[in-house]
Amino acid sequence: MAKNSKIVKNERRLVLVARHAERRAELKAIISSPSTPADARAAAQSELNRQPRDASPVRVRNRDAVDGRPRGHLRKFGLSRMRVRELAHRGQLPGVRKSSW
């Protein structure tokens, strides 16, 4: 079980990323466009740097939906590898079967 503070901090980051996503995309388009003048590009870069650090999507950590474990996360299920194994053995994941060959 992850610390509650870490889980809450990650949820706050998710909200911040969603709030700033549109403006970040606009600024990144201005910065990466070759037709943008140098002064406009510099202004866009400056504004992007002034945005909160946690508004960047790379700072969000995928966590287990049940207990918040940060490692061994499987995107398909939104769970950690251990939780997937546990639920699959119990038959609580629809369509998941133990492989045998």
Swiss-Prot record:
Which keywords label this protein? Ribonucleoprotein, Ribosomal protein, RNA-binding, rRNA-binding
Q: Tell me which stretches of the chain form a coiled coil.
A: none
GO biological process annotations for this chain's record? translation
Q: Which GO terms describe its cellular component?
A: small ribosomal subunit
Which is a Pfam family this sequence falls into?
Ribosomal_S14
Q: A single Gene Ontology molecular function, please?
A: rRNA binding
Region ranges (Disordered): 29-73
Compositionally skewed regions (Basic and acidic residues) per UniProt: 61-70
Instruction: Give the superkingdom in one word.
Output: Bacteria
The family database entries (InterPro entries) matched by this protein are listed as: Ribosomal_uS14 (IPR001209), Ribosomal_uS14_bac/plastid (IPR023036)
Q: How does it assemble?
A: Part of the 30S ribosomal subunit. Contacts proteins S3 and S10.
Q: What PANTHER family does the record tag this protein with?
A: 30S RIBOSOMAL PROTEIN S14, SMALL RIBOSOMAL SUBUNIT PROTEIN US14A
Q: What does this protein do?
A: Binds 16S rRNA, required for the assembly of 30S particles and may also be responsible for determining the conformation of the 16S rRNA at the A site.
The UniProt entry's sequence similarity note says: Belongs to the universal ribosomal protein uS14 family.
Tell me what this protein is called. Small ribosomal subunit protein uS14A
- State the organism of origin: Mycolicibacterium gilvum (strain PYR-GCK)
What gene does this protein come from? rpsN
